[in-house]
Amino acid sequence: MRVERVLLKDYTTLGVGGPAELWTVETREELKRATEAPYRVLGNGSNLLVLDEGVPERVIRLAGEFQTYDLKGWVGAGTLLPLLVQEAARAGLSGLEGLLGIPAQVGGAVKMNAGTRFGEMADALEAVEVFHDGAFHVYCPEELGFGYRKSHLPPGGIVTRVRLKLKERPKEEILRRMAEVDRARKGQPKRKSAGCAFKNPPGQSAGRLIDERGLKGLRVGDAMISLEHGNFIVNLGQARAKDVLELVRRVQEELPLELEWEVWP
């Protein structure tokens, strides 16, 4: 187990966030010790806005045994989702193609039920192991209340590993599906971002609504509504959380959109 003081901007895909005490745990016993005081769990740092003042709680990051995986067995929650998508395709296993390009770890993808219009994380789950109240518990997906970009984990629960529901398919078929998903994602920005900023209202596209209001290019400090896709806020270099929040406020003044990101603290 490694404990260090860090700036969370170096651990988030948006490149924003203040100081915290980072606990990197590699075993189940280390996880038990790390959770003996108030904590938060950090995955790959996407879909997350950390305030400039940082967080007072321990920030736990899963490594070691939590990054091991068996596509036909248990997959550690610290495993990168893009890696799994590619490995499944190489093995001729279908079920993850719709998650192509999502820069999350498995645990974070489960917690927020990450997905695209081609599929979501809950679709690929057979079982989920969650650590809470000092013990490890296994749940079937139906017990975790998955919905659009959300789940209902037990309070303080940490996803530790999952079993995937994959089916054998011809590799050519899987690759065609992945190419279709990849084409649909081509309009997304290359600059630092936390992923889609706002949830899509039922039957509508948040990005299109933002575009129609002429909000693309709206900027506060180094935080800007992407010119490439209206539902992305990008960091032009030195953006701070306060800049991002002000940009969110201005969008929400114009449109009744719900923020998709988690905000710390």
Swiss-Prot record:
Catalytic center residues: R149, C196 (proton donor)
Location of this chain's protein in the cell: Cytoplasm
Biological-process GO terms, alphabetical: cell division; cell wall organization; peptidoglycan biosynthetic process; regulation of cell shape
Species assigned in the record: Thermus thermophilus (strain ATCC 27634 / DSM 579 / HB8)
SUPFAM superfamilies: FAD-binding/transporter-associated domain-like, Uridine diphospho-N-Acetylenolpyruvylglucosamine reductase, MurB, C-terminal domain
Function summary: Cell wall formation.
Example of a GO cellular component annotation carried by this entry: cytosol
Residue span(s) of domain FAD-binding PCMH-type: 15-169
Catalytic activity annotation: UDP-N-acetyl-alpha-D-muramate + NADP(+) = UDP-N-acetyl-3-O-(1-carboxyvinyl)-alpha-D-glucosamine + NADPH + H(+)
Keyword entries, A-Z: Cell cycle, Cell division, Cell shape, Cell wall biogenesis/degradation, Cytoplasm, FAD, Flavoprotein, NADP, Oxidoreductase, Peptidoglycan synthesis
EC number: 1.3.1.98
Main location: cytoplasm
Top enzyme class: oxidoreductase
Pathway: Cell wall biogenesis; peptidoglycan biosynthesis
Protein name listed in UniProt: UDP-N-acetylenolpyruvoylglucosamine reductase
Protein origin, superkingdom: Bacteria
Disulfide feature: none
Disordered, as annotated region: 182-203
HAMAP family: MurB (MF_00037)
GO MF entries: FAD binding; UDP-N-acetylmuramate dehydrogenase activity
Family (UniProt): Belongs to the MurB family.
Cofactor dependency: FAD
